[in-house]
Amino acid sequence: MELNKTVSNPMLVGVMQLIKADGKTPDPKHQEMFMEELDKAEFLAPAEIKAEVGPDGEKLVNGKAQFRFPILTGADGRRFFVVFTDNATVEKAQAMEGASALPEEFVKETVTVKFSDLARFILTPNPDGSENTTYGIVINPFMENIVIPKNLVAAVTMRKQKEAKEKLEKVASVLAKSADPKVIPFPGNKDEGQD
């Protein structure tokens, strides 16, 4: 995770716009494109960061940094992990006022996260062992406002794990075939009946 990094996801933003334009029944091709881009993307997640400060006044995000990610609670009580697609969207969020304004902790500092980080954050039980009640992820809240429920995060994660397992099995199969234990004959090899 990097602190206050410049991030841009033009393909993901484009696919999000396609899905929004699709309305209530998104095109399956757009959904598949969204899942692919989601997996490739780096996001900016609001965070309260406790870290040592370097000589230049910047926080040092090394192994000793602690992050607290604020959770956005909707009017219906559902809790969301918030991420932004790019720095321009964070700046828009910082400039918002009124009912759509995010609390200050959502727009102060950001760290980069990948989808796999987000999945771990919302699918892992709380430190005390209780169920994590986060409903899902919201991308660009009060703007594009794309919601990815926890069950979809779990499905995408399981799909990625299945694909990785299939790739490993394919590689293992190729290696098993190429590691034929029979001896390759060459002059002077006594195992092949040559003297």
Regions found by a protein language model. Give the residues of each.
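An interfacial alpha-helical scaffold signature
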Residues: 1-195
